[in-house]
Curated annotation (Swiss-Prot):
Stored PANTHER family: GLYCOSYLTRANSFERASE, UDP-N-ACETYLGLUCOSAMINE--N-ACETYLMURAMYL-(PENTAPEPTIDE) PYROPHOSPHORYL-UNDECAPRENOL N-ACETYLGLUCOSAMINE TRANSFERASE 1
Matches recorded under Gene3D superfamilies: Glycogen Phosphorylase B
Pathway terms, separated by semicolons: Cell wall biogenesis; peptidoglycan biosynthesis
Principal subcellular localisation of the protein: membrane
Top EC class for this record: transferase
Topology of the protein relative to the lipid bilayer: Peripheral membrane protein
Pfam families: Glyco_tran_28_C, Glyco_transf_28
Record-listed UDP-N-acetyl-alpha-D-glucosamine binding positions: T15, G16, G17, N127, R163, S191, I244, A263, L264, T265, V266, S267, E268, Q288
Entry annotated with the keyword Transferase: yes
Keywords for this protein: Cell cycle, Cell division, Cell inner membrane, Cell membrane, Cell shape, Cell wall biogenesis/degradation, Glycosyltransferase, Membrane, Peptidoglycan synthesis, Transferase
Catalytic reaction annotation: di-trans,octa-cis-undecaprenyl diphospho-N-acetyl-alpha-D-muramoyl-L-alanyl-D-glutamyl-meso-2,6-diaminopimeloyl-D-alanyl-D-alanine + UDP-N-acetyl-alpha-D-glucosamine = di-trans,octa-cis-undecaprenyl diphospho-[N-acetyl-alpha-D-glucosaminyl-(1->4)]-N-acetyl-alpha-D-muramoyl-L-alanyl-D-glutamyl-meso-2,6-diaminopimeloyl-D-alanyl-D-alanine + UDP + H(+)
Name under which the protein is recorded: UDP-N-acetylglucosamine--N-acetylmuramyl-(pentapeptide) pyrophosphoryl-undecaprenol N-acetylglucosamine transferase
Length: 355
């Protein structure tokens, strides 16, 4: 393969948890001279985000089946077959040396198409519980990687690729030693927000007063109502934003983060070296609970599932956690991070491309 520009196809879409780790790997291999093409869907976030990162993208037509009616389920085989055919056409035109499946609806047809075309398939499972698509694709994949132990019994644990600016933050000892004043609480609801955080945090802030200062990211469409709730009752310093464009800056500012426990969020909080209060989204397989559990086990975080996430419970934790303990927890979080995940995934792709 010497002298030939190697080609990677990244299959990922739908949510930031799939797309951002894929972008980290794509940029890493582009820096090593690889050519990268993204396979996505035209109506999800990757359609807008990936081109902004200077990466070409092509689309297939596929969507999820969960919650759809009987007609959609009956039509599913035809839709899936069509998506596989579209992916095969793109695959034959681009001729990748290897494909990387990061999850999302696009990975299923894309992975099958790659296998049918004889292209090595490397899968990366971001969550502590494997999704349905990756469980199926694991049977035909050349290599299977996992971010957290337990998703697959024998797959190497490589962590989640996270953004370079998060990895570049000063370690907790440098960042937090000598910091004084109210505890800085970062509340992150994700791009879609988290209603339970938006509802509870203004009351928590009102009762804690000047013991804390807050930066609360509400998610799309919730800023005005949350801002009003804070302004009507909260005396402490607070900043309310719909989105946070620079998460590294937010992590650097914070002493503790309160958030959902999506796979990428957990990995970023760990890499940044921050204590966390994780509020897993309630799902039948408890995926977000399993994502956060390793950090709770090492003493870097506390999991409060939704029935336990009460105003009193959060106030009790924030009152107990004084700065020496927060620093200790931050150091444990950073120690638990796998900071070379991008390099490990890239190495697996390079190896698979040689086979």
């Amino acid at each position: 393969m010497s002298g030939k520009t190697r080609r990677l196809m990244v299959m990922a879409g739908g949510t930031g948890g799939h797309v951002f780790p894929g972008l980290a790997v794509a940029h890493h291999l582009k820096d090593q001279g690889w050519d990268v093409l993204w396979l996505g869907t035209a109506d999800r976030m990757e359609a807008d985000l990936v081109p902004k990162h200077g990466i070409d993208i092509e689309f297939i037509q596929i969507s999820g089946l969960r919650g759809k009616g009987i007609k959609a389920l009956l039509a599913a085989p035809v839709r899936i077959f069509k998506a596989i055919r579209q992916a095969k056409a793109i695959m034959r035109r681009y001729q990748p040396d290897v494909v990387l499946g990061m999850g999302g609806y696009v990975s299923g047809p894309g992975g099958i198409a790659a296998w049918m075309c004889g292209v090595p398939v490397v899968l990366h499972e971001q969550n502590g519980i494997a999704g349905l698509t990756n469980r199926w694709l694991a049977k035909i994949a050349t290599t299977v990687l996992q971010a957290f132990p337990g998703a697959f019994p024998k797959a190497p644990v490589v962590g989640n690729p996270v953004r370079e600016d998060v990895l570049a933050l000063p370690i907790p000892e440098q960042r937090l030693t000598g910091r004084e004043g109210p505890i800085r609480v970062l509340v992150v609801g994700g791009s879609q927000g988290a209603r339970i955080l938006n509802q509870a945090m203004p009351e928590i802030a009102a009762r804690m007063g000047d013991k804390i200062t807050l930066w609360h990211q509400t998610g799309k469409g919730a800023k005005e109502s949350v801002q009003n709730a804070y302004d009507n009752s909260v005396k402490c310093e607070h900043k309310i934003t719909e989105f946070i464009d620079d998460m590294a800056q937010a992590y650097a500012w914070a002493d503790v983060v309160i958030c959902r426990s999506g796979a990428l969020t957990v990995s970023e909080v760990s890499a940044a070296g921050l204590p966390g209060i994780f509020v897993p989204f309630q799902h039948k397989d408890r995926q977000q609970y399993w994502n956060a559990l390793p950090l709770e086990k090492v003493g870097a975080a506390k999991i409060l599932e939704q029935p336990q996430f009460t105003v009193d419970a959060v106030i009790e934790l924030l009152t107990q956690w004084q700065r020496p303990q927060l620093l200790e927890m931050a150091e444990k979080a950073r120690s638990a991070a796998i900071v070379d995940a991008t390099e490990q995934v890239s190495a697996a792709l390079i190896d698979a491309a040689k086979k």
